[in-house]
Amino acid sequence: MQKPRLSLGQIGNMSFGFLGIQFGWGLQLANMSAIYSYLGAKDSDIPLLWLAGPVTGLIVQPIIGAMSDRTWNWLGRRRPYFLVGAIFSSIALFIMPDSTSVRMAAALLWVLDASINISMEPFRAFVADKLDPAQRNIGFVMQSFFIGIGASLANALPYVFRYAGVSGTTSSGIPLTVQYSFKIGAVVFLLAILWTVLTSKEYPPEDLAAFERERAEPRGIVNLVGSLIAEIVSAIRDMPATMKQLAFVQLFTWLGLFCMWLFFGLATSYHVFGATSPQDPRFALGGEWGGICFAVYSVVTFLVAFVLAKLANLTSRKTVHTIALLCGSVGLLSVYFIHDKYLLLLTMVGVGIAWASILSMPYAILSGALPATRIGIYMGVFNFFIVIPEIVQALTFGRLIRALFGDENHNAPLYMVMAGGIFMACAALLVFRVQDVGDSQP
């Protein structure tokens, strides 16, 4: 089916929900470790407490992808999942800062991450469903744009409340600035998704009669689950060559990102602010500045998102992604040479450029290599190459750090940030071997 060209406003409407999704992710990334600590978790417990994200991504995304490929009702194909995920995500976000125990917070995080994945997974397929191949670059870049805005707002909101004079804590010791931010985040998440659901329509399956006949076949729950698993296995077995090549790019890219997310704040405290222990007042100052740095790279992300789309049209998606990953690599490696907090902000420019490309170019490249009837399932399987390295890192990096650097080496976080830069450089080199079948550029 020849799809009509959509206006920039229409593409913005269909991507606006990502602002809410990233608002939820941003609040989680910036605050969950601290929430666990306030509730009494030990530092050594935190990596395992973070397993909710990758495990739910590993399980939920391919299942939702396969289910959404088979769905068609009055809301469409993907939008029912946007809405269901948003409702449960908003509930979890609203309750999270009122947690009274580590177990309660951990349980809510599992609900939150599963629900966010329900909303997020169909968004990638939504772009491929709605847009002609010539517009997919701008479609995925528009998602990056709203991701950048959502993350920037989420990172800044607790600081806004603090400077507005909000102080105090809940009965569990969680700052009111965090509590208010999560509750606002719950509202933003739901409203952003509702905007996309209400302003964007979907195209029915090309052969609706055949689609309805297949869906009408009686299936028990066991057969349904079995068929979904069989479809996931089939998708992995029949994975297009481009997807296999991108898998290695994603593996090294996300190892680099996880090194940054887990260790950048600590590296800022010890290396730039000169803290000698977590009890040192400079440690907290460094952690706060690390949050500001993350806000900066989020701002850079939405500022450069559309520039990357234009450059991809002028050159190629592979060229843009390679250069962007190298920018991120240089940004992380350069932290070693920086001891001034303001110069540290410059490193985030490179990271922001890389992040804008990471959120768009691999998906634009992938969408051109996928059969239209299986885009949802393949987008879910593609998520494996993000969550598997995260699971491996959560389970092994603590032991690796102790083996290489010991427990008391405050340079270890800096070295792990630099390792993230090396991983990103490896990812950039691997882009050269990717075959972009949907790009007219070389």
Predicted features and spans:
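Helix-loop boundary and gating motifs at the non-cytosolic
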Residues: 2-54, 244-249, 253-278
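Intracellular loop-helix junctions on the cytosolic face of multi-pass helical membrane proteins
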Residues: 1-9, 100-107, 118-119, 123, ...
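C-terminal ends and interior cores of transmembrane alpha-helices
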Residues: 82-101, 326-339
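Intracellular juxtamembrane helix-capping segments at the cytosolic ends
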Residues: 118-131, 357-371
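Helix-to-loop junctions at the C-terminal end of transmembrane segments
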Residues: 59-75, 303-316, 401
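Loop-to-transmembrane helix entry
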Residues: 42-52, 176, 180, 274-299, ...
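Hydrophobic core of transmembrane alpha-helices in multi-pass small-molecule transporters
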Residues: 92-96, 100-119, 343-357
